[in-house]
Amino acid sequence: MQNKNLQEIEPRTLRLINDSLYLIDSKFRNSKTNQIVFMNILKNDFNVTKILRKMSESGVLGSYWPTFKKSIGQMQFDLFHIYTVDEHTLSVLSNLRFMGTNECNKKYKFIYEVYQNIQGKEVLYLSSLFHGIGKGSNKDHSKVGK
């Protein structure tokens, strides 16, 4: 199902994807098959962060998940955040994925061991996507995201 050698998406393919985003409608989003595919992406041990980043860059993630779309390019004007909400969210996911790497095992053995014992990591990844869900609005995101 996946080609681990695939590195980039050709510009022509990206244009075709962009021209087809209108096909990702509520029927598409509510399809059990498509929901399973999305969860399988999160379960994927190979480059889930890169896949979601490509989905975001191509507009697919925002079309599939309209709430995420609201966070794209959304600045956070406070002392704690230097990235846009969408970039911050994908960075959180990337940091979670780092916890399962050999590099993390060498630097932070305890964190690595705790991470290895987590069952259903896809739920953790999904929660990282949800953590900034309310930041795309002008309201208190800690309340909107509940």
Q: Across the structure, where does each feature detected by a protein language model lie?
A:
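Non-catalytic interface/linker regions that flank or bridge core catalytic/transmembrane domains
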Residues: M1-H81
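Divalent metal-dependent catalytic cores for phosphoryl transfer on phosphate-bearing substrates
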Residues: T84, I111-K146
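Flexible, glycine/threonine-enriched loop-and-boundary segments that flank and lead into catalytic domains
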Residues: Q74-D78, N102-N117, F130
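Secondary-structure transition/capping motifs at alpha-helix termini
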Residues: Q7, G62-S63, M99-K106, Y115-G120, ...
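Composition- and surface-driven signal marking solvent-exposed, interaction-prone regions
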Residues: R12-L14, K54, P66-K70, N105-I111, ...
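Large, well-folded core regions of big proteins
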Residues: D78, I82-E87, R97
